[in-house]
Amino acid sequence: MSALPQAAPAASAHHDVLAIRALIAKHKRWDYIFGLLGLLALMVGVLTFAALFAEMAIQGIPRLNPDFFTNFPSRRPEQAGILSAWVGSTLVMIVTAIVAVPLGVGAGVYLEEYGSKNWVTDIIEINITNLAGVPSIVYGLLALGLFVYQFGFGQSILSAGLTLALLILPVVIVATREAIRGIPRSIREGSYALGATQWQTVKDHILPYSSAGILTGVIIGMARAIGETAPIITIGALTFIAFLPASPVTATPPFLSFEWLFSPFSVMPIQMFNWTSRPEAAFHQNAAAAGFVLVLMTLAMNGLAIWLRYRLRKNLKW
């Protein structure tokens, strides 16, 4: 008689164990399915990029030779090159970096370390986030009215650099803030405990420890800017240019010239756009070669960001 009451709880416990095991097995199946779907989505993106990159490589590599990098554009596709385009891209990126990096890093540091948390900073943060999603051609329209006409910079390298600096500024600000947020509070408290001022703490501790994340954001932003076409076309960049801007370096004191800032220019995406609009297949091959070079430059910049982040984080420990 006493065995019956004991058997009932044992059977109930066994049933509960089986139910839990079935639930765990179900969750594992869903985990497996979700992981498989994620891998499939990743492979679609990677394979699509690989196919496009391979197509550009197959078409463009035969055109890659020293003359392609040292010749100006030409009506004859076999003689055309990207000299003015890659020089223009380089100079525009220099202006972009000089403007965007100090402003972006400074704004990020202020918002995280100095700015009070109130409705004003909340509005600023929301606007920064929204600016990151604004179509690039809107920046081009803004630059056309402001830099080209209002400030009188004209259709120049300076206007292009300032336009792209505005474009990547939200990226640099967000990257700076995220990097600073990752620093433990104990770093700041230890610095203040030793009598350091807020500026000394930022200069000697916050910025060095967050440099990996900041550099990553800056390089990724620059990699985006180098491939932009819409804002550069909007401000009036040339699609055909057979001369180089004035040299930034001179043979006489002060050995620096800023005339190049106001020179007409072209960049690699616009040169590609010009070639793809031509009916001749040889120009399309030139566009593929220029695209291959541009993708390699972008991959190199992203690879540099990953390497710098790894090296800096390896050397900085807390």
Specify the residue positions occupied by each region the protein language model found.
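Interhelical loop and adjacent transmembrane-helix boundary motif
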Residues: 73-76, 80, 232-295
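Periplasmic/extracellular loop-to-transmembrane helix junction in inner-membrane transport proteins
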Residues: 17-40, 54-96, 117, 274-285
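Generic hydrophobic transmembrane alpha-helix motif, especially the helices
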Residues: 129-166
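Hydrophobic alpha-helical transmembrane segments of multipass integral membrane proteins
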Residues: 87, 91-99, 103, 107, ...
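Transmembrane-helix boundary motif in ABC transporter permease subunits
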Residues: 96-128, 141, 149, 305-314
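Amphipathic cytosolic juxtamembrane alpha-helices at the membrane-cytosol interface
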Residues: 111, 116-120, 125, 188, ...
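Transmembrane alpha-helical segments of polytopic membrane transport and secretion proteins
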Residues: 1-42, 306-318
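Transmembrane alpha-helices
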Residues: 97, 175, 198-236
